[in-house]
């Protein structure tokens, strides 16, 4: 797994910027994606993938320790759909 610090270092090296600038850029990217998803917009990066906000329906879940069935409220979550460019890059 790559950590945020490792990602910042990689961005800084590839973009030829210092780590503080890379950290600011990464945090701005994360904030922009989050804001778009909160407002109901998908974030599509052609060749890489699409971030989507989806609503999970309410339902029931089971407590694994007690076996008790509990109601789970509807909630929103984020999904990432891999783009063809990234998929083919991973499989080459």
Curated annotation (Swiss-Prot):
It comes from the Bacteria. This is DNA-binding protein HU. Belongs to the bacterial histone-like protein family. The lineage of its organism: Bacteria, Pseudomonadati, Pseudomonadota, Alphaproteobacteria, Caulobacterales. It holds the Pfam family Bac_DNA_binding. Residues 58-92 are annotated as: Disordered. InterPro entries: Hist_DNA-bd (IPR000119), IHF-like_DNA-bd_dom_sf (IPR010992). Keywords: DNA condensation, DNA-binding. GO terms for cellular component: cytosol. It comes from Caulobacter vibrioides (strain NA1000 / CB15N) (Caulobacter crescentus). GO terms for molecular function: DNA binding; structural constituent of chromatin. Histone-like DNA-binding protein which is capable of wrapping DNA to stabilize it, and thus to prevent its denaturation under extreme environmental conditions. GO terms for biological process: chromosome condensation. Homodimer.
